[in-house]
From Swiss-Prot:
Record pathway: Amino-acid biosynthesis; L-arginine biosynthesis; L-arginine from L-ornithine and carbamoyl phosphate: step 2/3; Nitrogen metabolism; urea cycle; (N(omega)-L-arginino)succinate from L-aspartate and L-citrulline: step 1/1
GO biological process: argininosuccinate metabolic process; L-arginine biosynthetic process; urea cycle
Residues at which L-citrulline binds: Y87, S92, N123, R127, S180, S189, E270, Y282
Family assignment from sequence similarity: Belongs to the argininosuccinate synthase family.
NCBIfam families xrefs: argG, PRK00509.1
GO cellular component, as recorded: cytoplasm
Residues reported in the UniProt entry to bind L-aspartate: T119, N123, D124
Organism: Aedes aegypti
Pfam families membership: Arginosuc_syn_C (PF20979), Arginosuc_synth (PF00764)
Name of the molecule in the record: Argininosuccinate synthase
A GO MF label: argininosuccinate synthase activity
Residues holding ATP: 10-18, 36, 115-123
EC number: 6.3.4.5
Amino acid sequence: MSGKEKILLAYSGGLDTSCILKWLLEKGYEVICFMADVGQEEDFVAAREKALRVGAKDVIIKDMKRIFVEKFVWPAIQMGLVYEDRYLLGTSLARPCISIGLMESAAEHSCSIISHGATGKGNDQIRFELSCYALDPKIKVIAPWRLPEFCERFQGRKDLLDYAQKHGIPVSATPKAPWSMDANIMHISYESGILENPAKAAPEELYQMTQSVMKSSNTPIKVDITFKEGLPVTVLEHSGGKTLETPLEVLTFLNKIGGEQGVGRVDLVENRFLGLKSRGVYETPGATILHVAHKDMEVYCLDREIFRVKSFLALKMADYVYNGFWYSPEAEYVRTCLVGAQKNVSGKVTLEIFKGHVIAIARESTKTIYNQELASMDVHGTLSPYAATGFIEVNAMRLKEHYRVFGSANME
């Protein structure tokens, strides 16, 4: 039996983690590599062969697509999570999901240490490590890109390439794209390289999930999305009568039709947890469609004040997820409140998807407090128009008293 300490390395198959794998082996560790399939286009067979050739003891490849969609993406849609009004948290949600597989595999293979290739400036190091510590407080972490010894040896990509050549680590012959990319079934994110200049538009060839609206069909796509307690249940495509029911099928289908219509492209500068601002470009077609539909159903079904309190809590929850606190007491508490607010968010929303836009055009629910007769401008109904006089007088009292004391409002 080997006396070497065992490390589980979160492995991507790329240059960085392949060099980290070899470096850990040089340090005397026995290394097992872990890869999570969360829907990214990846040649897992080739990555496995590469890791074994470099010297990994074993390579674990875990299919986590269903868990990712059902336990992370769907709850995020249900809670209405958006970071800084635009980012639907595709990468942020994947990290705690991957951490589950990482920690399960660490336990199965008796690894007391994990390692990863996240850089010291990004959010992923925080998300991975906070999630892993929450799932197993005893776990130890080796983060090479935060170790002086590693950083001094590898100043940049050239040093990594030289190291790979020296140790026979296979390097892709395909020229490296001038940006980095992270993909899963929910989205693709792009950053760094030429994207670090916010004044320069991202090139069209960058996008992989969506096509330009200039090339998209001139025929709108119409779908019905049904929700139960805030969770997507089914999608019906009007033109073909096709119905999708499982979360994985629903998201895959919406990604396809949303991508064809150029839905879900976002180019932004965001605030990282470390305090840095970072430029990111995202493609999130299917989740964008679901988010628009869910927001429409929420406003239709929820009491006004519940909706406003829920919206405030969703902002807090989005911050927690972005910053790596999916597993935290505060997130557990807020999640309970947000899910509780969704008990009446059930019904059907009809959407038109066209040229980058997602428009809710009709909705139905047995849970809404919408009263057509009460709201109608054509009949008085049970709400007497005379009652508004007292309502206005009471609300005007505060304004009258304020401006009586401090002078009339400035008309400019």
